[in-house]
Amino acid sequence: MVQSKEVNRDQNREKVAAPLRVSRSLYTPEQRIKRDKSAWTWIQGILAPIQFLVFLISLVLVLRFLATGEGQNIAIWSIVIKTATLYTIMVTGCIWEKVVFDCYLFAPAFFWEDVFSMLVLALHTAYLLALATDALSIEQLMYLALAAYATYVVNAAQFIRKLRIARLDHATQQAAMKQATTSGMEVPA
């Protein structure tokens, strides 16, 4: 009797957990076509590594200033340039999302990445506002920039992870289609 209850409990757990294991593709076939045909996909692919390079240079300049007190102006301006690249990639990313998913932000496929992007934008914007109004000391500005940069790194990792999952999912789908066609099974359109 005890063993029977345990088996039933395990079966119920499997039924509850089953929907959690179902993998949904990041893109529908139509969205994948839109993504592949859009010039905005290429633009995002160019801007992302540029922004990362600007981030790395700025990070070094900010850390150098905090460690030595040298290079204050270049550190300040590097953060402004990093923020401008962030705004640029956010605007072009919104356009890309509109083209592929038919909404400018918070498409289900990238909902949490977009939510976290809002924090990244808020911290970078807070830096610009504090810089313009002298609301913070130079050291406080640099630490605010580092907080903004930390959120940027997390957000970039979110996007990289999501795109890697999409690439692996697509490869799995392609392999399954190839397997189905070579075994003579009919592949749905």
Residue map of PLM features:
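Long, non-globular segments of proteins
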Residues: 1-3, 7, 182-189
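Hydrophobic cores of alpha-helical transmembrane segments in multi-pass integral membrane proteins
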Residues: 2-3, 12-22, 43-66, 72-100, ...
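Short alpha-helical hairpin
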Residues: 20-30
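Cytosolic juxtamembrane amphipathic/interface segments immediately preceding
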Residues: 28-41
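Charge-rich, acidic-biased intrinsically disordered regions
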Residues: 67-73, 174, 180
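Short, highly charged, low-complexity non-transmembrane loops/tails of multi-pass membrane proteins
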Residues: 166-188
